[in-house]
Curated annotation (Swiss-Prot):
This is UDP-N-acetylmuramoyl-L-alanyl-D-glutamate--LD-lysine ligase. It catalyses: UDP-N-acetyl-alpha-D-muramoyl-L-alanyl-D-glutamate + L-lysine + ATP = UDP-N-acetyl-alpha-D-muramoyl-L-alanyl-gamma-D-glutamyl-L-lysine + ADP + phosphate + H(+); UDP-N-acetyl-alpha-D-muramoyl-L-alanyl-D-glutamate + D-lysine + ATP = N(6)-(UDP-N-acetyl-alpha-D-muramoyl-L-alanyl-gamma-D-glutamyl)-D-lysine + ADP + phosphate + H(+). Keywords: ATP-binding, Cell cycle, Cell division, Cell shape, Cell wall biogenesis/degradation, Cytoplasm, Ligase, Nucleotide-binding, Peptidoglycan synthesis. Pathway: Cell wall biogenesis; peptidoglycan biosynthesis. GO terms for biological process: cell division; cell wall organization; peptidoglycan biosynthetic process; regulation of cell shape. SUPFAM superfamilies: MurD-like peptide ligases, catalytic domain (SSF53623), MurD-like peptide ligases, peptide-binding domain (SSF53244), MurE/MurF N-terminal domain (SSF63418). Carboxylation is probably crucial for Mg(2+) binding and, consequently, for the gamma-phosphate positioning of ATP. ATP binds at G110, T111, N112, G113, K114, T115, T116. GO terms for molecular function: ATP binding; magnesium ion binding; tetrahydrofolylpolyglutamate synthase activity; UDP-N-acetylmuramoyl-L-alanyl-D-glutamate--D-lysine ligase activity; UDP-N-acetylmuramoyl-L-alanyl-D-glutamate-L-lysine ligase activity. Its EC number is 6.3.2.37, 6.3.2.7. The peptidoglycan of T.maritima was shown to contain approximate amounts of both enantiomers of lysine and no diaminopimelate. It comes from the Bacteria. It comes from Thermotoga maritima (strain ATCC 43589 / DSM 3109 / JCM 10099 / NBRC 100826 / MSB8). Optimum pH is 9.4 for the L-lysine adding activity.
Amino acid sequence: MNISTIVSNLKDLILEVRAPYDLEITGVSNHSSKVKKGDLFICRRGEKFDSHEIIPEVMEKGAVAVVVEREIDLDFPYIQVFDSRYFEAKVASLFFEDPWKDVLTFGVTGTNGKTTTTMMIYHMLTSLGERGSVLTTAVKRILGNSYYDDITTPDAITILSAMKENREGGGKFFALEVSSHALVQQRVEGVRFDVGIFTNISRDHLDFHGTFENYLKAKLHLFDLLKDDGVAVLNESLADAFNRKSRKITFGTSKNADYRLGNIEVSWEGTQFVLETPDGLLKVFTRAIGDFNAYNAAAAIAALHQLGYDPKDLASSLETFTGVEGRFEVVRGAKKIGLNVVVDFAHSPDALEKLLKNVRKISQGRVIVVFGAGGNSDRGKRPMMSEVASKLADVVILTTDDPRGEDPEQIMEDLIKGIDKRKPYLVLFDRREAIETALTIANRGDSVVIAGRGHERYQIIDEEKKVPFQDREVVEEIIRDKLKGRKYAQ
């Protein structure tokens, strides 16, 4: 690709070109650590950092031109654009040759259930012999090869590069979890989806979006990115908010839903329900626990059924779906000390409420919950989460989540505002101590819920400090110590 190709395809996005039209571009990058010789480097202005300031550095690393949002006082080839984030998505799609074409492409958004629904789609398709890739918060797997990072939806270049790798490797589908941040920051503007799924919406990320209306608007933008024959699959509660021309399919429990759930039963073994589809009734079982997973499964089945897959085959393949790491993840080793322990990513009032209601429903003993709140995020939801915890758990242990540079004392103060002081609660800033205390005070048959961080492998203390910490691993380590202690005591 050369500058001429870029200009001829994206001229409406460009203010000025000061670069030879025959200049060859052999790569696209947006981070100084990833620059390679021959790259077009995209400069972006963020809240804390402006990469226009490091143009000399990327020049030294081999970039042959830069994309800027303002004029630069350097003798170096550049393209000035109106919006570098939007341009990044479009030029990446151009460079990687629209890698979503001729590939079934799924985008899944919503406050809760994004990761699980996306992984259900991936699981069902691979179980049916299809080859493809998936990018979610918890799992990133390109044609069977997995890697880890803690970003829900990567940047446009990463997404489109992965899509090209998928298509060139013979992948027939690509399933992508799409956050509201990614939609606002235009990370998926270079993608077109065959199916967009909107699982549900409740309060979250208002520190970023400002209002609930803006949050909803951001989520709905996913449907603006559908292919011409694309399908919108959404929770029936969102049907009135949908005002696009695309084909709309709903799932829910009312008689008006296109895919109607009923007879939902939850146990420690999994979740079963009946799904009324346009092709008849379907009995569905998945080892993923929680009535919310019935809704996730319904959304995933609806999406694939609309593309021509047999609902019975889809339901059969879901029987082997065991769930997602850090999403109602049962720590199996806890049975050895007589407890049920659940690790979950729930970090909003609605998610925590659904989680605790499901645990309460299938538990014989008390429910003990350990959770905190992320720093530098929506403060308003903190007391709401504590109120939910006080209402649905027998014992609440407040602890640290990811402070991200915010004073943990301030976070805790916000959380305590929602606590019912008439019920047992503890405040333990050390998360490991909080988890160990929960496992120690629990009696045989009790359920311990550790919420907020799910699969995450690091605790973010501030911008400079991340410490290794995974809730499930900590639980397993404490259980091993307890079993060892019992052995020595005998």
